[in-house]
């Protein structure tokens, strides 16, 4: 059986955007740090990494649409943090952000990863932003690098 998979090696000329939701910035700043670390560790050139800041997770799909429509980027890593509160707001924001990112990704057929935390507590968010559960920003960036290389092997 033939296996086709991406790898984690960047050549240094890949242009990747990170879209970061500033809301809950104490968490999301750490996710960005993790994503940047992964990009650099795997051979990325910092001049080819762009950070796009949006107010909150709900705005990520709109920014993603503009970023991909520009044609300037090979892949996008989306990060944010939606933390459950006492109202149903969490459910609406989480669902629409997820659907929006998925829809834009399918429209442009470019590698995009979902590094948006959807958690029940600030403690869970901290654990996923560099504590007990690793850094999900780092993981999202490695995922987008792997998918970028897979797309190349599949002929985009």
Swiss-Prot record:
InterPro entries: LS, LS/RS, LS/RS_sf. Catalyzes the formation of 6,7-dimethyl-8-ribityllumazine by condensation of 5-amino-6-(D-ribitylamino)uracil with 3,4-dihydroxy-2-butanone 4-phosphate. This is the penultimate step in the biosynthesis of riboflavin. This is 6,7-dimethyl-8-ribityllumazine synthase. Its EC number is 2.5.1.78. The keyword Transferase applies. One of its GO terms (biological process) is riboflavin biosynthetic process. GO terms for cellular component: cytosol; riboflavin synthase complex. NCBIfam families: lumazine-synth. One of its GO terms (molecular function) is 6,7-dimethyl-8-ribityllumazine synthase activity. It comes from the Bacteria. Belongs to the DMRL synthase family. Pathway: Cofactor biosynthesis; riboflavin biosynthesis; riboflavin from 2-hydroxy-3-oxobutyl phosphate and 5-amino-6-(D-ribitylamino)uracil: step 1/2. It comes from Campylobacter concisus (strain 13826). (2S)-2-hydroxy-3-oxobutyl phosphate binds at residues 86-87, 128. The keyword Transferase applies. It catalyses: (2S)-2-hydroxy-3-oxobutyl phosphate + 5-amino-6-(D-ribitylamino)uracil = 6,7-dimethyl-8-(1-D-ribityl)lumazine + phosphate + 2 H2O + H(+).
């Amino acid at each position: 059986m033939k296996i086709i998979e991406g790898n984690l090696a960047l050549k240094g000329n890949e242009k990747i955007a990170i879209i970061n939701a500033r809301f809950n910035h104490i968490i999301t700043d750490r996710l960005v740090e993790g994503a940047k670390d992964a990009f650099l560790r795997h051979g990325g050139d910092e001049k080819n990494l762009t950070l796009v800041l949006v107010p909150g997770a709900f705005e990520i799909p709109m920014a993603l649409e503009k970023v991909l429509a520009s044609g300037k980027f090979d892949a996008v890593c989306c990060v944010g943090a939606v933390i459950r509160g006492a109202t149903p707001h969490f459910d609406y924001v989480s669902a629409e952000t997820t659907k929006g990112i998925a829809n834009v990704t399918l429209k442009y057929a470019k590698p995009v990863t979902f590094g948006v935390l959807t958690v029940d507590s600030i403690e869970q968010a901290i654990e996923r932003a560099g504590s007990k559960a690793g850094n999900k920003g780092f993981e999202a960036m490695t995922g987008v690098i792997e998918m970028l290389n897979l797309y190349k092997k599949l002929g985009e």
